[in-house]
Curated annotation (Swiss-Prot):
Mediates the nuclear export of proteins (cargos) with broad substrate specificity. Belongs to the exportin family. One of its GO terms (molecular function) is nuclear export signal receptor activity. Keywords: Cytoplasm, mRNA transport, Nuclear pore complex, Nucleus, Protein transport, Translocation, Transport. This is Exportin-7.
């Protein structure tokens, strides 16, 4: 569609308005607008449109249209079209917005008007040919705005030019960032060709100048990107030193004047700039810079002011503490006298200020938010060990004075408001002690430091004991809802975890001085008694914090790590506490089994208990341990009607049973332990599970728990399912699994499920079904051919219903969920490698669906998925190739029906492989080379047709070059699939790829 008249324009304007004002027609209008945008003439028409109107709806759609049009027809643009911007302020602003949005479109894959491969290559084209010019335009616009800074009209140019500069500097230059990645790139890989522009225009100075004048956050973000530029961008050491000196000079000026820090965002971004400076440059480089002394002094003042002022973001504190930690940890690498770093002078002051700030801030209720954000808070603490241990004795004195005073007041306080303050203060001190303990290494440790650790640790252990005694005496459970109290408990867990890691078990650092000091202060103590006290504390939490999910989860994590450690497990295996748990593990012992709302915690608990059970010392307790589960299964089987079975009480019991059993079987990692569990459950295995499915198939909470349990049950972890040659156990396991799978699939296929509930009620179940079926296929404990031999439909029924499940949702829906798509491709690979003939002989609907799925995954950004697809397709075609040579092969009819009657399948596969080889970088070249040769030898005519397509699709100037590249591709290759032939072809593919890339770049072909 095109705009040729005034009437056409009014029609276009009306569409732009309706796009925003009539949401019910948005999709229909969007399709119409796309017909305008994807017409190359739109690159000329947009000027006429903008001359007619300044309507914001039209301007927004014009910008959107230019993005689509330019990204689709970039190679057709003339230089004038690429650089055209009106000299008026309004059109200047529109031009800057267009350029910024074009960069975003090139940098981020959004929409479907280009494939991933096309988008990637056109993005590289922009980077190599025009991005530097756009960056120069942004710098010119900034200078233009600064020259007219007194005129308010130029403010918008300045802001838009800063946005454009940031878009240029934050471009994914090496195209390695995942589409879904949220991780920040710490090093900016600006091309070397930009060096002259940096030398001539000095953008660093420009952005600092703008910040000083306008206090612009965006200018600081641009500075952050420049500070992050790779060091190799500067060709000589003198240039690097000069650049570093400039940063130190400019940042020192801002540190002295505190320019713009009344704006929190400025303070945060500036903190990131300072931290990134140390990330990219060594302390050795910093200390040699003129002005370092002034810089480190002002940085210390800035950090202390930040710690004292609660208005600043915790993220600012995190970046500053990280910076100081990096500086301190680098002292050992400094050449010459380390005192020239001044870190021993300033670091203790920073540490003292941090501790005092947390104590002072605890008077505010807002501190609960920081303490309850466990992950962020622990992240902030990561830098504390370096700061605290540089002058450990001074740090210890400060902590002990505060701890003794506050803990004494806390234990005697009755006023609820004041009690909350003391709880927050104690929590922070315990967290700080915990992170200081964790910071002990073989490098920074000494006997004196170990004694200090003992001084600090004994106070925490005593506080834990007094606190638990106080809590158990409370008549009500309101403490479970007090955030300050929860924070204190989480700090205890954090401390105990760190103490266990450093001073107990195989990863601990040997030291007798800490236990000697603890014994002096609190009575005889060693690592075993401390471990038991930790386990007792875990048990206390299970009882008194049953309703708090976070405390229970972290207590379970600590329990698991204690049981799973080689040395700590030996201490725990053969003792009275363990024996009591194995004999009695009901909700009376672990109240959270009934009271906690998170059923995952049940699995974690029984995984840990199972680890204790399945040892030589404790396996004799199995019958006594498993008896409660046996009673539950018998109770479920004895319920006679579906109505009686379908109650909330039974539902909770079923979910609990399945999650508990999954935890137990997860820890049965030996043949002996697995066989013990199998012999107990297999008699009632399929009967009880099928009964559960029949009644609760519409409840994803039940079916997910059931399918995940089976998935773990059939998982041949550590070869635990390899039975004796005389045993039929492997066949029994798969036969029962097939029954359950077929029952689930047949019922869920009949269910009417809405689009919004599709993942929860169906796709998640399909995903787990595929996972458990894959584990059966690759387990190696069952010969599936036996089923067909004896007329048992277990295997064929499982395959049939698995593909019915896959076909019951669209491929787009299945592939839109990463876990489901990965499970699907993994299952297809297992089937194609182990049961190729079964795949080839499937009905046409299933076979085409499989091939389309594998074709789609060939260009997946996940190399594992693309490689699996390659392997699967190659195996199918290889088997077909060899069977075609056998005139009496039974599967000839299936090959002709599935392959040759659908010739476009092979055509599309070869086409995509060639395209990936030419244009893509993120792929396994050896896998794709093998697959391409297999396809070519299997069907030469299809390859010949595609070769002609590629020859004609390039410019008329170079068809002979393309043809020559294809001739070289097949040079010295033979008509066979032997390894030697594949290796030769792989070498040819490397040459072919190189030649085709050169041809592509010379002709400007990126699509």
């Amino acid at each position: 569609m095109s705009i040729q008249s005034e009437q056409d324009f009014f029609k276009f304007e009306e569409l732009c308005k309706d796009f925003y004002l009539k949401p019910e027609e948005t999709i229909k209008i969007d399709d119409i607008l796309h017909q305008y945008f994807l017409n190359p003439n739109f690159l000329i028409e947009y000027k006429q449109i903008l001359s007619f109107t300044k309507n914001s709806y039209v301007v927004a759609q014009v910008i959107r249209g230019l993005i689509k049009c330019v990204t689709s027809f970039w190679t057709s643009l003339t230089p004038n079209q690429k650089n055209d911007m009106s000299k008026s302020i309004e059109h200047h602003c529109i031009g800057l917005r267009i350029l910024k949005d074009i960069i975003s479109e090139f940098n981020e894959y959004i929409g479907e008007h280009l494939t991933v491969l096309q988008h990637r290559n056109i993005s590289i084209s922009l980077r190599d040919n025009i991005l530097l010019d756009i960056f120069c335009i942004s710098l010119e616009s900034l200078n233009y705005a600064l020259a007219n800074s007194m005129d308010e009209k130029f403010k918008s140019i300045k802001e838009l030019a800063l946005d454009l500069s940031y878009s240029c500097l934050s471009f994914d230059f090496i195209k390695t960032t995942s589409i879904d990645s949220s991780e920040e790139i710490l090093t900016v890989q600006i091309p070397s060709q930009w060096k002259s522009t940096f030398d001539e225009n000095n953008p660093l100075e420009l952005f600092f100048k703008i910040y000083k004048q306008y206090h612009s956050t965006k200018s600081l973000e641009c500075i952050l990107q420049i500070v992050s530029i790779r060091r190799s961008f500067f060709t000589t050491e003198d240039e690097r030193v000069k650049f570093l000196a400039s940063i130190v000079q400019y940042t020192t000026e801002i540190l002295k004047s505190n320019i713009g820090f009344n704006e929190p965002n400025n303070h945060l971004v500036f903190s990131r700039v300072i931290e990134r400076l140390k990330t990219n440059y060594h302390l050795n480089n910093l200390v040699t810079v003129v002005g370092y002394n002034d810089w480190i002094s002002n940085l210390s003042t800035f950090t202390i002011d930040t710690l004292k002022n609660p208005q600043f973001s915790p993220n600012s504190i995190y970046f500053l503490l990280t910076l100081w930690a990096k500086l301190v940890s680098s002292i050992i690498y400094v050449k010459g006298d380390p005192s020239k770093t001044y870190l021993e002078k300033y670091s203790p002051i920073i540490m003292e200020s941090f501790i005092n700030s947390k104590i002072d801030n605890s008077y505010s209720d807002e501190e609960d938010e920081h303490l309850m954000d466990y992950e962020k808070m622990v992240e902030i603490l990561e830098g504390i060990p370096h700061l605290g241990r540089i002058t450990y004795q001074a740090t210890c004195r400060q902590i002990i004075l505060l701890f003794d005073s506050i803990s004494s007041k806390f234990l005697n306080e009755t006023n609820p408001t004041q009690l909350e303050v003391y709880e927050r203060q104690c929590a922070w001190l315990v967290y700080i002690i915990g992170c200081l303990i964790l910071g002990r290494t073989s490098i920074n440790s000494s006997e004196e430091h170990d004694k200090i650790d003992g001084e600090l640790s004994v106070r925490v252990f005593i506080l834990i004991g007094y606190n638990d005694k106080k809590l158990s005496a409370e008549s009500n459970t309101q403490y479970q809802y007090r955030t300050s109290r929860i924070s204190l408990e989480l700090s205890f867990i954090y401390f105990m975890q760190n103490f266990r890691r450093i001073y107990i078990g195989e990863n601990s650092i040997s030291s007798s001085k800490i236990y000697q000091r603890i014994s002096e202060l609190s009575g005889p103590t060693d690592h075993t008694s401390v471990l038991f006290s930790i386990v007792q504390k875990i048990g206390f939490n299970f009882k008194y914090w049953a309703e708090n999910d976070e405390i229970i989860k972290k207590s379970l994590d600590m329990f698991w790590e204690s049981v799973n450690g080689h040395s700590t497990s030996k201490m725990l295996i053969d003792n009275k506490i363990t024996k009591d748990i194995l004999k009695t593990h009901s909700s009376q012992v672990f109240p959270f089994l009934e009271k906690n709302s998170n059923p995952r915690n049940r699995t974690s608990l029984y995984k840990t208990i199972g680890k204790l059970l399945f040892t030589d010392e404790n396996m004799g307790f199995f019958d006594e341990f498993i008896a409660p589960f046996d009673d539950t299964i018998k109770h479920l089987l004895n319920i006679s009607t579906p109505e009686q079975f379908r109650t909330e009480e039974i539902k909770r019991k079923v979910i609990g049973l399945l999650r508990d059993l999954r935890g137990i079987i997860t820890s049965a990692n030996s043949k002996r332990s697995y066989l013990l569990f199998f012999e107990w459950i297999h008699l009632n295995f399929s009967e009880v599970l099928i009964k559960i499915i029949n009644v609760w198939v519409d409840s994803p909470e039940v079916t997910t728990s059931l399918l995940k349990f089976i998935s773990e049950f059939v998982f041949n972890r550590q070869s635990r399912l390899i039975f004796d040659s005389s045993s039929a156990n492997g066949f029994i396991i798969f036969r029962d699994t097939s029954k359950i799978l077929v029952s689930y699939a047949s019922l869920i296929l009949k269910a009417n499920i809405s689009k919004q509930d599709l993942y929860k009620f169906k796709i998640k179940g399909i995903q787990t079904s595929m996972l458990l079926f894959t584990r059966c296929l690759v387990g190696g404990y069952c010969n599936f051919g036996v089923f067909e031999l004896y007329g048992d439909p277990s295997f064929t029924s499982a395959i049939d219903y698995i593909f019915q499940l896959c076909l019951s949702v669209s491929l787009d829906e299945l592939m839109s969920f990463p876990k489901a798509s990965k499970a699907y491709v993994t299952m297809l690979e297992a089937l194609c490698l182990g049961h190729t003939l079964s795949i080839i002989q499937l009905n046409q609907q299933y076979f085409i669906h499989i091939m389309k799925s594998l074709h789609r995954c060939l260009d997946s950004q996940d190399v594992t998925m693309s490689s699996s697809s390659c392997t699967s397709i190659e195996k199918i075609i290889t088997v077909c190739y060899y069977h075609l040579k056998k005139k009496n092969s039974q599967c000839l009819q299936a090959i002709h029906q599935n392959f040759f009657s659908n010739s476009n399948i092979l055509y599309e596969i070869i086409d995509k492989i060639i395209s990936i080889i030419i244009y893509e970088d993120n792929f396994n070249q050896f896998m794709f080379s093998k697959l391409l040769l297999t396809c070519i030898i299997f069907h030469q005519d299809t390859f010949t047709t595609l070769k002609q397509k590629y020859i004609h699709s390039f410019n008329s100037q170079c068809p002979e070059k393309v043809e020559k590249a294809f001739v070289q591709l097949m040079e010295n290759t033979l008509d066979n699939l032997e390894t030697k032939n594949k290796d030769k072809f792989t070498s040819n593919v490397s040459i072919f790829r190189k030649e085709m890339k050169l041809i592509s770049s010379s002709t400007g072909r990126y699509l």
